[in-house]
C-alpha cells in the first residue's frame, strides 16, 4: 500500500489509469485532503510510486501485510461472510456511519453486509467525517492506540473538537471535560 501526500483523488486516478490494465491498483482510503492511500498488486504500487515521483508527487510505501481495501481482498471478504452469516446482530442504539458508504446505517442485516464489503472497498473517511459535521456532530473521540484518526479529523475539520483516548488517564480527562 502506498500513501500519497499532497494530491487529490482525481490526480491519483489519472496516474492509476496508466497502469490499471496490468492488474489491481485502486484507491483504498480517502483519508483527508492531501492524504490518499492506494492498494493493489505490489508491482503496480511500485510502478505508481515511480509515476508519482516523475510528476513530483510525494508518496510513502506503507509496511503492511496485505493489500487492504481493494479487490485483492475478495477472498478474505468471502471468508468473513461465511464466518458471520450465522451470527446474530442486534439493532444498535445509535446509527453507525459506515466507512464504505459514508452514510448512517442501523439495520443489522445491512451492518453485516457492510462489514464484509469494507474488507475490499475504499474507506471513505473524509466523506464520513464531513457527513457527521454536516449533521451537527461536534465532538470526535478516537478510542484505541495512537492518534492517527484524530489527526485526520483535524486535517478535514481544522476547528473540530477531536481527541484520542489511549489510557485510563485519558478516559478520566475526557470525563472531567464533559
Can you annotate each of these PLM segments?
Residues 1-120:
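Alpha/beta catalytic cores of group-transfer enzymes, especially the acyltransferase/condensing modules
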